[in-house]
């Protein structure tokens, strides 16, 4: 192929409608999406070990919350991989402090194990340190031995919003391939640059997005489920994320990780350079409620403040504590409180008695507050005690 012709080649992203959530319909939709996106026959060869990487951020409130990738989607991708003569392994490590096995159990991945599919909790695997050539903020990471043995990685996220980067899709999904300590370190060094460093290192070959049931609002765990009935697929993860974000109502350059990955040359952000096949974006898009627009907690008179350095474990623990209090009818007692999560600067003009600080990585002045909750991640019971002003510092 000539240089000019190669430059004109577009990234292809498929969008396929799925008529329901039963096994046969999901399998047909996933297969069609993969085929429309160019298939994987030239990427996956007989004898290869192929990691299928779902998004299992943490144990979700339910299997229908839109927080975690459906096992039916992963099963369908695994079947395609097996047909190509390769060995598919579904593997994940959930957010810092989160129980991957509990997430698998709630979502129904144990059923796949019963059927003979390999489903691995990476947190139980041996860890290894590897160097990152060309990393912008990461020069070394600790990953898992199984990951280093893979011949190819397929990112299989779910379509959802995120409280730090607008959305979390195929690119950010790779953060689950490092140990909990590095997940936290990435947030502290710069989440978007760090996540793109991981993409550049692991080089996923394909993405299949579970957009059958997504999540809007306070993602990545405690948002509101959204029925979309779609599957997206493509080889260019930047293009896949750009189109996935567009379907949710986000311009591609609004999403920091997509923008950074494109700037590094990892894929196409320019929609004029992306060929969408199957359904048209205009026909399926739906503006998702953004995290800052989800006022379920703000309406209760509680203000939550976090920064890019606040990791998923802290944010999820805090929000789940607030929703637990809301369900128990005790959130009213914390009205007027401002909660600072992780290494986040103090807001001005708020009396210290109305502040709660959460997380062992809090700034020194935050740790001196009467209501400071240590822990990485902090325990929900301790967070609730602090919010209710029970016994001062929680440990």
Residue ranges and their predicted role:
Residues 1-395:
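N-terminal and secondary-structure boundary signal
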């Amino acid at each position: 192929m000539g240089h000019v012709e190669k430059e004109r080649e577009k990234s292809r992203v498929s969008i396929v409608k799925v008529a329901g959530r039963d096994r046969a319909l999901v399998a047909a939709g996933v297969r069609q999406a993969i085929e429309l996106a160019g298939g994987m026959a030239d990427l996956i060869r007989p004898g290869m070990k192929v990691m299928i990487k779902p998004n299992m951020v943490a144990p979700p409130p339910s299997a229908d919350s839109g927080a975690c990738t459906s096992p039916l989607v992963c099963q369908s991708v695994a079947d395609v991989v097996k047909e190509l003569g390769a060995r598919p392994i579904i593997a994940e490590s959930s957010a810092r402090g989160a129980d991957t096995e509990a997430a698998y159990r709630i979502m129904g991945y144990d059923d796949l194990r019963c059927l003979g599919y390999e489903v691995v909790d990476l947190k139980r695997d041996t860890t290894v340190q590897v160097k990152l050539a060309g990393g912008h903020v990461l020069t070394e990471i600790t990953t898992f031995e199984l990951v280093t043995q893979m011949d190819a990685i397929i990112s299989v996220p779910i379509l959802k919003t995120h409280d730090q980067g607008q959305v979390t899709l195929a690119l950010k999904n790779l953060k689950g391939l490092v140990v909990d300590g590095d997940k936290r370190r990435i947030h502290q060094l710069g989440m978007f640059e760090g996540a793109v460093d991981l993409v550049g290192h692991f080089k996923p070959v394909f993405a299949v997005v579970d957009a059958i049931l997504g999540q809007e609002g306070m993602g990545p765990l405690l948002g509101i489920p959204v029925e979309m009935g779609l599957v997206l697929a493509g080889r260019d993860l930047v293009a896949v994320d750009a189109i996935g974000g567009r379907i949710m109502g986000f311009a591609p350059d609004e999403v920091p990780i997509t923008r950074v990955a494109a700037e590094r040359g990892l894929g196409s952000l320019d929609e004029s350079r992306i060929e969408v096949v199957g359904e048209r974006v205009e026909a399926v898009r739906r503006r998702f409620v953004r995290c800052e627009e989800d006022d379920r907690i703000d309406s209760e008179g509680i203000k939550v403040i976090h920064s890019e350095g606040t990791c998923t474990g802290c944010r999820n623990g805090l929000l789940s504590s607030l929703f637990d209090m809301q369900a128990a009818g005790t959130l009213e007692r914390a009205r007027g409180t401002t909660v600072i999560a992780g290494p986040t600067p103090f807001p001005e003009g708020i009396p210290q008695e109305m502040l709660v600080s959460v997380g062992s990585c809090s700034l020194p002045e935050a740790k001196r507050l009467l209501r400071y909750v240590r822990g990485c991640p902090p325990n929900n019971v301790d967070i609730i005690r602090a919010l209710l002003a029970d016994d001062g510092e929680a440990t």
